[in-house]
Amino acid sequence: MFTGVGTAIVTPFSNGEVDYGSYEKLVRWQIESGVKAIVVAGTTGEGVTLTVEEREKLVALTKQICEGKAQVIVGTGTNDTRKTLELSLSAEKSGADALLIVTPYYNKPTQEGLYAHYKYLSERLSKPIIIYNVPSRTGVNISPETVARLASDCKNIVAIKEANTDVNQADEIYRLTNGDFYIYSGNDDRAFHMICAGAKGVISVASNIIPEQMVELANKTLQNDVVTARNIHFKYLELMKVLFVETNPIPVKAALNLLGIIKNELRLPLVPAKQSTVELLEKVMKKVGVLS
């Protein structure tokens, strides 16, 4: 698995269709900036609104662009175990290096249900699996004990993207797995702290617009250059937070539009950012030198 930054890449749209040209330019910028993984069709990529054909084309295109320079990780999680398996097998066939599988949402499984879900998938998939824990969006939290049990019982469950706002959860996973399990921060504003505590990196939203800066933040922290990393963290902390003043990926798409990289389009039920959000983004981006 990668260490450093994996970008949870947006999916650009133009007139309702995937804008593959803008997508390719965005991915190439990420690779040139030192990003070590591209996460396709995740939350930030509006994966739940993509067709299977769009997913497969995006994965194949990303694989072609990365050319071994970065891993291609595909978001395949749903709240239906069989549907998740179908999307995961499709992603494997299309060239995925690993699978990011969010905990089932809405139906709120128990810890035993979460264990059974991931174990079922691990027994039928060949690529490494990254558990994705984001209770604020799913309504369920996978416990450190369940994560450790899966890490012990399923050889291809190798990592977790931990987006629980309680950093003690990541600490407990690290302790229970003896530091042998890859932990990635799922929150940009917690990346510095979590890497200091043993995480291998961050799966980042902010790196869509500040890839070089997020790469430097992660690398300096991994190299134990805490002073430099802390300075980067605080310089961009306000921007990291502003990217979540509305539901992700609404603000980051508005920010990319301000940079002239993509159109400010989303698929329903998401809609473009409010004007007040755009103005706030513009103000903060100018403040930190991202926008002139």
Curated annotation (Swiss-Prot):
Annotated catalytic residues: Y132 (proton donor/acceptor), K161 (schiff-base intermediate with substrate)
Residue numbers binding pyruvate: T44, I203
Protein's pathway: Amino-acid biosynthesis; L-lysine biosynthesis via DAP pathway; (S)-tetrahydrodipicolinate from L-aspartate: step 3/4
Site location (Part of a proton relay during catalysis): T43, Y106
MF GO annotations: 4-hydroxy-tetrahydrodipicolinate synthase activity
Function in brief: Catalyzes the condensation of (S)-aspartate-beta-semialdehyde [(S)-ASA] and pyruvate to 4-hydroxy-tetrahydrodipicolinate (HTPA).
Name of the protein in its database record: 4-hydroxy-tetrahydrodipicolinate synthase
Organism in which the protein naturally occurs: Fervidobacterium nodosum (strain ATCC 35602 / DSM 5306 / Rt17-B1)
High-level lineage: Bacteria, Thermotogati, Thermotogota, Thermotogae, Thermotogales
Gene name in the database record: dapA
